[in-house]
Amino acid sequence: MENMPPQSWILTCFCLLSSGTSAIFHKANYSRSYPCDEIRHNSLVIAECNHRQLHEVPQTIGKYVTNIDLSDNAITHITKESFQKLQNLTKIDLNHNAKQQHPNENKNGMNITEGALLSLRNLTVLLLEDNQLYTIPAGLPESLKELSLIQNNIFQVTKNNTFGLRNLERLYLGWNCYFKCNQTFKVEDGAFKNLIHLKVLSLSFNNLFYVPPKLPSSLRKLFLSNAKIMNITQEDFKGLENLTLLDLSGNCPRCYNAPFPCTPCKENSSIHIHPLAFQSLTQLLYLNLSSTSLRTIPSTWFENLSNLKELHLEFNYLVQEIASGAFLTKLPSLQILDLSFNFQYKEYLQFINISSNFSKLRSLKKLHLRGYVFRELKKKHFEHLQSLPNLATINLGINFIEKIDFKAFQNFSKLDVIYLSGNRIASVLDGTDYSSWRNRLRKPLSTDDDEFDPHVNFYHSTKPLIKPQCTAYGKALDLSLNNIFIIGKSQFEGFQDIACLNLSFNANTQVFNGTEFSSMPHIKYLDLTNNRLDFDDNNAFSDLHDLEVLDLSHNAHYFSIAGVTHRLGFIQNLINLRVLNLSHNGIYTLTEESELKSISLKELVFSGNRLDRLWNANDGKYWSIFKSLQNLIRLDLSYNNLQQIPNGAFLNLPQSLQELLISGNKLRFFNWTLLQYFPHLHLLDLSRNELYFLPNCLSKFAHSLETLLLSHNHFSHLPSGFLSEARNLVHLDLSFNTIKMINKSSLQTKMKTNLSILELHGNYFDCTCDISDFRSWLDENLNITIPKLVNVICSNPGDQKSKSIMSLDLTTCVSDTTAAVLFFLTFLTTSMVMLAALVHHLFYWDVWFIYHMCSAKLKGYRTSSTSQTFYDAYISYDTKDASVTDWVINELRYHLEESEDKSVLLCLEERDWDPGLPIIDNLMQSINQSKKTIFVLTKKYAKSWNFKTAFYLALQRLMDENMDVIIFILLEPVLQYSQYLRLRQRICKSSILQWPNNPKAENLFWQSLKNVVLTENDSRYDDLYIDSIRQY
């Protein structure tokens, strides 16, 4: 190290600095969980890696992770190395990774190496749905308890497939071979026999054609829906004494108006079930026989099913069975009975006929009778149900009922939900039935879903009939999608105890005057959405003293007509009203009153109106429209086409506000300073506007703010100090803006902050080295969650486009200090090298001469007299070139020394130098003791050190003695671009001789050479040169 040259020291320092910088940024790349979000929940450590466009299992996941969600990616290969570092895994979700929607990416589906998961000794749940697998993966760990292979291409199950899965409790193999499968789903005899702990088995939507034999006795739930099973024998379920759920729906289906590809059994026959097929299922709690084309229900099926609690018989042909109902006497524990859509083809019955045996269902809680299709319901038709002590829900939706006696629902001790949606119930005015007035504009009863959910039953929905927010208030009545376009005083007689009423989609055009609901005085939740209500009376709803929630949204019909009266003064009369929804009414003017008044209202939804017109009036009439809502906590002003908010209107908002929503408008400017007048504001939603600027210090104007939603705007940068004192802010959403760079100073706070969620996805960052400042902030604040971090991507430079900022390699970036040091070192090194090269090129001879002169002085040398010369010329030539040496000795020497006329004495190196003297001394002596110095030049010799030294010594005589002694003989064309040679040719052309190519000219050459040697050079100088010299 002590002898290391300076260049090596510089290179070493540069490498150390570079490696140190690389180490710093390399460490930063993995300090935050990426590309997955790791969440701790009690003892679980969950890695959320779904929807990340991953093509392989990330290797940056923490080793303590217990649950990993890798669903909805593009992972097609699972090897032994995929989960090798994750030995604590208990659950793996790999659903939807080889989707058929992307055949070019996943032509062969997912490939799982045999034994790839075998080392995961703690794994209990493995989900592999929708991955185009062709077989059950081999080599799965014995610890596995749940395996889901729904929606794959598995057509066969063998003993080998299930070998090693002795601890499996739940196996899902549904939807593998049904709609697009033209073969049989084969199950080897005894394939499930060794799964002695199996509790749940799903083989639904597979072309089975029979119940698999030798099922394990441990089974609790068996799903065999839509398996094309036509015959159930007495032996099929023997040995399954522990079964609590059996689903046989969709076998021999009723295909009339089926919303999916449907193939009925031959001649529309029903499934054949042996009378004693269920005899051994004594623990059965749930039985689904929906859409099996049943026409009769033998009582013998239920002989031993005394514990059955839920029975589904919808989509069959059971109108006659509903009338007789002999099997109902065998179901003492039944709580839920669904007989929906059992109507007969092309029959519109006058009445519903319910068997007296329904009265035997003493445990029944919910009765679904949708799609029976009848015209009229009278009180006597439900007399067999009124004695049921636990009946809480009656569902008569979509029956096309035209006339109904609401007294039929009286005398039910626990009835909470009456569902009559989708009928033709009409208005009753003064006892007159207007059922013939049909509304043809009702909302269509269709679904927008194009795909079927394999986890949801085809034939009945598990969604609540009525919104839980409504039923929470008490007894509920749903009359939506009917023909009640006018409500008479006697319309709801007998419903004094109703607390939740839904009258949406009835095309009601009524002007309420405060008498319509007098027979239902205890309503607390009233839904009147999607009607055509005319608000022309301030006494509307005055009969509803207990009303707390009123939904009047989507009643824009009369609000859009300028000449019609628009009064909302009724609000101040509702002294218990807490929530009012006036959204999507297009309100742009009000009659008489310019303010909404209420002392009880807590939440007002005013979205989808025209505040832009109300607030832009020149007189500011409606600026105080919300001022008198003294206790308002939440105000929704979204989608009001606002391009600006007048300061006067904003300052007239209730100061009690805690949540203010102004999203979906066209705001380009927002006056942040006005937020200081709302000391209780916790949530501000300004998303989906056209805002460009943020305040320099948010907390200066909104210190109480906890949630700030600013997504889908045009913010391009965050001001420095934006969050400097925002200690209460918890959630900041900046997603889908035009932010390209975030400085550390914008997010740093002067005090402890509560910020826990920062949303940044949808922006396009400039991923240059300047982003390292933001990356370091991310690494220093690991407690702040960045949702969808994998979607926080780069827009440029080009090689980083569409990559996440967390995958950005910053090892090539250095800090400012390091960059300055490296720049100084490299600049110094480069400058020194260039300076040394320049000095060497320009002053090498001078330095060399001065060095040797000084060295000679120090050694005692004295300048010798040069006045005495012994030779006429010293010959400098390439002694190593034999041809040149031969020419000099035999030609040059001969013609100059041995000529008869004026012989010349030459000094030759090989003949006249003193042996033992240094070369430089001999050279200097030869030049100084000769009148002339002749240089015999070849291309090789012109580049040699000997020539350059002799030339500089001869040139030195010109400087010391003012004697030009140099003569050139060019044996080859050399130094053609030499400035010195060109200048000499202009001044003294005769001192440069070229060996002639023509032998006849040699005599002239020798004569010219002899003349040059024997005469002074300056006597032959060009006259033009001499005249120019004399001028100075």
From Swiss-Prot:
Inhibition and activation profile: Activated by RNAs having enough uridines.
Main location: membrane
A Pfam family annotated for this UniProt entry: TIR
SUPFAM superfamilies noted in UniProt: L domain-like, RNI-like, Toll/Interleukin receptor TIR domain
Single biological process term from Gene Ontology: inflammatory response
Domain TIR: 869-1013
GO cellular component, one term: lysosome
Family annotation (InterPro entries): Leu-rich_rpt, Leu-rich_rpt_typical-subtyp, LRR_5, LRR_dom_sf, TIR_dom, Toll_tir_struct_dom_sf
Cytoplasmic topological domain residue ranges: 840-1032
Disulfide bonds, paired cysteine numbers: C36-C49, C177-C181, C252-C265, C255-C262, C470-C500
A GO molecular-function annotation: single-stranded RNA binding
Keywords attached to this entry: Disulfide bond, Endosome, Glycoprotein, Immunity, Inflammatory response, Innate immunity, Leucine-rich repeat, Membrane, Receptor, Repeat, Signal, Transmembrane, Transmembrane helix, Ubl conjugation
Residue numbers on the Extracellular membrane side: 24-818
Record family assignment: Belongs to the Toll-like receptor family.
Assembly and interaction partners: Homodimer. Interacts with MYD88 via their respective TIR domains. Interacts with UNC93B1. Interacts with BTK. Interacts with SMPDL3B.
Role description: Endosomal receptor that plays a key role in innate and adaptive immunity. Controls host immune response against pathogens through recognition of RNA degradation products specific to microorganisms that are initially processed by RNASET2. Upon binding to agonists, undergoes dimerization that brings TIR domains from the two molecules into direct contact, leading to the recruitment of TIR-containing downstream adapter MYD88 through homotypic interaction.
Record's protein name: Toll-like receptor 8
Upper classification of the organism: Eukaryota, Metazoa, Chordata, Craniata, Vertebrata
